[in-house]
């Protein structure tokens, strides 16, 4: 199965670029599943319902978010109504939406988990405890974990959550931050 993961889409210029390029990338590489972090897709910060619909229409199977997800009020109903837009799973259960979805593909069902790190972020549960609980409930064998965090050290720890069970994408790495060289393969198929 071929995945494309894009993030962090920022403002109108980022949204316009994704709308223009993503369909071509999907075609060129034969992508079977696309995950896009759209939490900053709106020009005013956050993501609106229209932004999410545009990303989904141009090819995003799942849109993940982070701590800015609730900045645009129009996203609230969409979070509750659609399975393609996620907020972090470790937000309080009273928050709109969910942080876990299962999407059917020709290759089987892919479970996507969206998490947010706790450093410099208030009112979120432990991401490791949250993902452990989700894994115990799921019967899926293919997981896609998106983990947005504010500190690079958390990246290494997140790699062990779904070892040999998943694809993992750590988000919130922007081009103006120092290079991390944090890529590593834990075991085959992770």
What are these regions (language model features)?
Residues 1-190:
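Acidic, metal/ion-coordinating pockets
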């Amino acid at each position: 199965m071929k995945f494309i993961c894009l993030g962090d889409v920022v403002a109108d210029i980022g949204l316009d670029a994704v709308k223009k390029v993503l369909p071509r990338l999907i075609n060129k590489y034969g992508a079977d599943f696309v995950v896009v972090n759209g939490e900053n897709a709106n020009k005013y910060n956050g993501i609106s319902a229209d932004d999410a619909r545009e990303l989904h229409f141009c090819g995003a199977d799942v849109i993940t978010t982070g701590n800015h997800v609730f900045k645009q009020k129009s996203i609230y109903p969409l979070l509750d109504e659609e399975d393609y837009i996620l907020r972090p799973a470790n937000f309080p259960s009273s928050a709109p939406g969910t942080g876990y979805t299962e999407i059917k593909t020709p290759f089987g069902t892919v479970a996507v988990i969206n998490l947010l790190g706790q450093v410099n972020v208030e009112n979120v549960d432990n991401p490791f405890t949250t993902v452990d609980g989700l894994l115990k409930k799921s019967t899926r064998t293919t997981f896609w974990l998106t983990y947005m965090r504010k500190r690079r050290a958390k990246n290494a720890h997140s790699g062990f959550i779904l070892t040999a069970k998943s694809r993992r994408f750590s988000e919130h790495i922007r081009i103006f931050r120092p290079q991390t060289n944090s890529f590593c393969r834990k075991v085959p198929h992770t």
